[in-house]
C-alpha cells in the first residue's frame, strides 16, 4: 500500500495572487499534485471554466451538501460560499497522491482542525498598498467591495500565525519555487517516513525468527 499523500493547504487574502502562483506551481512536471477544485456560489467570471477553476453551484445546492456532511470545509466570504468536497480529497490522499487545496483562510482553519498533519502555506502580499493595486487592476469589483476585501485582508494576515509557512508573492515564479521547496522538504520529515521503516524493521525481525 502506498504512503498517504500530503494535503497542502494554500491560502491568503483575496487579490494576493493565489491562483496565479498555483498555476505556476502546476506548470512544471517536477512534482505530481492533484489540484482539488473548490466549490463556490459566487458568479462565474469571464474565462473561468466550471470544474476547472471552481465548481459553480447555486446557494441551495451548496447548503444541501453542507447539510449532508459532504464538505471538508466551507466558508462564507463577501456574500458567497466557498468550500472543498470531502470524498475526492480522501480518495486521492489514500492513493499516495498529494492534494493541493487553494482555499480561503476561514476554510483553511477548519481543515487544520480536522487534518492537523496537513501542510499549511499562507501567501502574503509585499504590503497592503500593493494588494489594493492588484484588486483595482482586476477590474471585477466595485470600490466598496475592494474596501471590504482590504479590511478582510488585514484580519486574515493577523491569522498567519496559524499556518506552518508564509510566502511573500513579490514575484510569481519565485513565490511558486518557494512553495515547491516547502513541499519537497515536508516529504522528508521523519514523522512522515518513519512508518515505512518501522514496517521494514518488523519484516526483517520476523524473517530472522523464521530462520
From Swiss-Prot:
Does Kinase count among this protein's keywords?
yes
Write down the EC number: 2.7.4.8
The UniProt GO MF terms for this protein read: ATP binding; guanylate kinase activity
Lyase as a keyword of this entry, yes or no, is: no
Listed A to Z, the keywords are: ATP-binding, Cytoplasm, Kinase, Nucleotide-binding, Transferase
Per the record, the major location class is cytoplasm
Report residues binding ATP: 12-19
The record's top EC class is: transferase
Could you name the Gene Ontology cellular component terms for this entry?
A: cytosol
What is the superkingdom listed in this entry's lineage? Bacteria
Q: Which reaction does it catalyse?
A: GMP + ATP = GDP + ADP
Instruction: List, alphabetically, the SMART domains matched.
Output: GuKc (SM00072)
Q: Where is the Guanylate kinase-like domain?
A: 5-184
Instruction: Quote the Pfam families the UniProt record gives.
Output: Guanylate_kin (PF00625)
The listed locations are: Cytoplasm
Task of the protein = Essential for recycling GMP and indirectly, cGMP.
**Record's family?**
Belongs to the guanylate kinase family.
Recorded hits in NCBIfam families, A to Z, give: guanyl_kin (TIGR03263)
PANTHER family membership: GUANYLATE KINASE (PTHR23117:SF13), GUANYLATE KINASE-RELATED (PTHR23117)
Q: What is this protein called?
A: Guanylate kinase
The organism is: Streptococcus pyogenes serotype M1
Amino acid at each position: 500500500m502506498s504512503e498517504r499523500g500530503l494535503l497542502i493547504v494554500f491560502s491568503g487574502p483575496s487579490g494576493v495572487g493565489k491562483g496565479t502562483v498555483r498555476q505556476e506551481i502546476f506548470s512544471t512536471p517536477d512534482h505530481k499534485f492533484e489540484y482539488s477544485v473548490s466549490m463556490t456560489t459566487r458568479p462565474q467570471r469571464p474565462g473561468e471554466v466550471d470544474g476547472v477553476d471552481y465548481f459553480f453551484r447555486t446557494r441551495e445546492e451548496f447548503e444541501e451538501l453542507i447539510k449532508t456532511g459532504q464538505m471538508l470545509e466551507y466558508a462564507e466570504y463577501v456574500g458567497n460560499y466557498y468550500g472543498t468536497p470531502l470524498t475526492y480529497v480522501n480518495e486521492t490522499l489514500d492513493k499516495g497522491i498529494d492534494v493541493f487545496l487553494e482555499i480561503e483562510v476561514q476554510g483553511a482553519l477548519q481543515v487544520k482542525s480536522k487534518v492537523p498533519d496537513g501542510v499549511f502555506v499562507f501567501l502574503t502580499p509585499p504590503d497592503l498598498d500593493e494588494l489594493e493595486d492588484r484588486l483595482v487592476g482586476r477590474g471585477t469589483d466595485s470600490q466598496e467591495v475592494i474596501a471590504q476585501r482590504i479590511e478582510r485582508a488585514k484580519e486574515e494576515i493577523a491569522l498567519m500565525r496559524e499556518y506552518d509557512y508564509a510566502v511573500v508573492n513579490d514575484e510569481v515564479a519565485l513565490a511558486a519555487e518557494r512553495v515547491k521547496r516547502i513541499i519537497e522538504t515536508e516529504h522528508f520529515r521523519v514523522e512522515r517516513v518513519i512508518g515505512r521503516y518501522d514496517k521494514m524493521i518488523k519484516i526483517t525481525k520476523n524473517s530472522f525468527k523464521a530462520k
